[in-house]
Amino acid sequence: DLARTPQNYGRFKTSRGSLLLAHGRDPYFDGWSDTIQLNYGNPELQQAMIGELLRIASQCDGVRCDMAMLVLPEVFERTWGIRSEHFWPKATAAVRKVSPDFVFMAEVYWDLEWTLQQQGFDYCYDKRLYDRLREGHARPVRDHLRAGLDYQSKLARFLENHDEPRAAATFTEEVHRAAAVITYLSPGLRFFHQGQLEGRLKRISPHLVRAPIEPVNDRLRRFYDRLLATLRHEVVRRGEWRQLDCVPAWSGNGSFENFVASEWRGSQGERLLSCINFSSNTGQCFIRFGDDAFRQQKWQLMD
């Protein structure tokens, strides 16, 4: 393996002399040169890493675990040819025994989000929603949001992070606003990245730890102020969410396919409706609420 992929290894000076060590990597790409791979097939290593998590839990409220799925036994064996026992169920249980409210968030891909949720993670990256919003079509977004709430409520929703380009550089301003409403009015953890609310354009490497001065996009800043105010409403914080079906406004009008609609419903009857035309064209639709709450009453819609 060393002769075939020398870029995945490095020689390091240690107290035990010069050692040839493998860089951490996933099965599909070269190793990360700023990392060293640990052998999770070694039970003593797993116990040592649980000890590290316990130490961290005594100092903060939670951790984001980078590429957390690489530790899963089936992924680890596919990458390194080494069998291992499950690590995350033991690790999350050990930490919660001491710090019950400690939060685990996983960076995870390859449709393994549910697997890690079942192994103790409170939240998992929702890269699937992000990718579908970038593609710019409403139907795949709706399909993704049809998943069960036991799964969706444990997803971390985002429009940018340190691995992705800036949202303001990725989307037009109109699409940015629409994607933000879809993302952050969905259930789950709402993840905002430093500089996102100000419309920063330049992606910054976390290794650089500094950034150029950029002007604030006042229009986006005001938009996010309004969005954050909406997210503070009790109906969003403690209510129940559901996706709503959109149907044609009249026969032959296919523009209903471009809409994404949902609502939050509170315990006192309050309702917050979200309806987004996720396209560049004018469209029309009817929304099915699936109950009789609107019949024989007058309602005033407030934007």
Task: Please place each PLM-identified region on the residue numbering.
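Active-site and adjacent substrate-binding regions of carbohydrate-active enzymes
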Residues: 1-303
